[in-house]
Amino acid sequence: MKLLGKAVLVTGASRGLGQALMATLARRGARVVGVARHAGEMEAAAAALRAEGLDAHALTYDVGDKEAIYPLVGAATALVGPIDVLVNNASTLGPTPLPLLLDTACEDLQRVLEVNVVGAFRLTKAVAGSMVVRGQGLVLNISSDAAVSAYPRWGAYSVSKVALEHLSRIWAAELEGTGVSFLNVDPGEMDTRMYRDAVPDADYSKLNRPEVVAARLVALLEGRAESLPSGTRLEASKLEAA
């Protein structure tokens, strides 16, 4: 896929992997809209890229709020045109320190699912119709190794990523032949604020930098993404950077 001129929507783009993806995509010529709940951080990230002469925009919405989805997509489309690539990156862990399932409040589980699964589902629904009509589009869902491993205390987050991945596979089956494809990517353990909140005693020097992972994901998009079967699951650690 040639990213030059492509309209890309990245959620959770005010920090961490989302911010790194937004920057890397913009520097490859994409027209990027970043979305996050934190207005100041989101606008600062976009403004820094615009200062480089890049096509980057900031929107402030909560993807876990169903009333925000269509205004979000409408605003993004007004800025860069119909979305070619959607990156569902926004995630929440729920309360930290991470609790055991026995101690997890139902309301906290519900919030994690609203953001990580239902929000991504709503956004995908909101952009997929246009993609089908145009005969092209890619949805990149940022998953986790927690989707395949049962880590104590990561229950709510793990369940959300399992659901997100399987939704991708069902989307892939239902939209086969339309030109719209779906990929799940496990970025691996990264030195992000979210990971530090979850694992405060980790050796952060051994974790991946978001910028490194972003470079690998963008290389995937520019390389073999379109040739992979829709619904494929990938690990960023096994990808090559551009």
Model-derived features with residue positions:
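Active-site helix of classical SDR
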Residues: 124, 160
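The beta1-alpha1 cofactor-binding region of Rossmann-like NAD(H)/NADP(H)-dependent oxidoreductases
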Residues: 40, 60-71, 106
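C-terminal helical subdomain
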Residues: 177-180, 184-185, 192, 201-242
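Conserved glycine-rich Rossmann-like NAD(P)H-binding loop of the short-chain dehydrogenase/reductase
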Residues: 28-44
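Residue(s) in the substrate-gating loop at a strand-loop-helix junction
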Residues: 144
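Conserved glycine-rich cofactor-binding loop
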Residues: 7, 12-15
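Substrate-binding pocket helix/loop in short-chain dehydrogenase/reductase
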Residues: 97-101, 105-110
